[in-house]
Structures are given as C-alpha cells and as structure tokens.
Amino acid sequence: MTKQRTLSIIKPDAVEKNVIGEIYSRFEKAGLRIIAAKMKHLSKAEAEGFYAVHKDRPFFSALVEFMISGPVMIQVLEGENAIAKNRELMGATNPKEAKAGTIRADFADSIDANAVHGSDAEDTAAQEIRYFFSDTEIFG
C-alpha cells in the first residue's frame, strides 16, 4: 500500500447544490484525509492554466467557462492509494455511466457539469497540488 496525495475539486455545480459536506464525508469514510482546502472563484486565466493540457480539445472553452461560473472547493486528499480511491469514489466522467453510489452518479448533471475533478496519476497530482497550494498550506 502506498500513501499518496491527490487533488480534488468540487466543481461549481456541486458547490451550488450545497453538497460539499456530503462529498467530504465520502472522502473521510473511504479513509482519505483532507490535508488542505480552500474555496475559490477561479479567474479565467487560472482555469485556462489548470486545464492547459486540454487547450486544443473542442471542449476546452466550455470547460473553462463552466469552471469560472461559480466558486469551487479545492482540496488535497491523502491516504493509501489516494488517487485510485478518489477516482473510484468519483465514478465515470459521464454520470450516466457512473456506478450507483458514486459522487457523479449522485450529484452530477451531465458530462460537463460532473461535480468533481480528481488527479489521474502521481505526476499530475503533484503538479495540480502545486498549482493551487503552497507547502505551508498543506497539513499532512
């Protein structure tokens, strides 16, 4: 078992639905510790920078507009196999394909407004965590 850190973002649709606490409860019940957290309304530049890997994809502009449409809750999760565990909790990107009981099956509206973001690998997790948090903001 490997202790890992991963970045999680509760997106504007889920923040608007007031389900932050329910999502946090799922993280904690799965053995993930929240070791850093902040609520933020992303600027267009911040959203574009965070999702720069997708800049040439057809959905990029819509994704950026969605991510700046309201506040997001950004957190660092830590635990055994945190990346895979968080991705399992989130469910499939398309909520229609997500297993019952996953965050996206329960709280997402569409493939675009899909409630949460989670890092997909250790290198991207480290990069994404550094994008939003300094070392002094992480308590693990």
UniProtKB/Swiss-Prot annotation:
Positions of the catalytic residues: H117
State the UniProt keywords alphabetically: ATP-binding, Cytoplasm, Kinase, Magnesium, Metal-binding, Nucleotide metabolism, Nucleotide-binding, Phosphoprotein, Transferase
Cofactor(s) needed for function: Mg(2+)
Write one Gene Ontology MF term: nucleoside diphosphate kinase activity
User: Of which family is this protein a member?
Assistant: Belongs to the NDK family.
Function (record text): Major role in the synthesis of nucleoside triphosphates other than ATP. The ATP gamma phosphate is transferred to the NDP beta phosphate via a ping-pong mechanism, using a phosphorylated active-site intermediate.
Q: Which PANTHER family match?
A: NUCLEOSIDE DIPHOSPHATE KINASE (PTHR46161), NUCLEOSIDE DIPHOSPHATE KINASE DDB_G0292928-RELATED (PTHR46161:SF3)
Protein name, as recorded: Nucleoside diphosphate kinase
Q: What species does this protein belong to?
A: Francisella tularensis subsp. holarctica (strain LVS)
Underlying gene: ndk
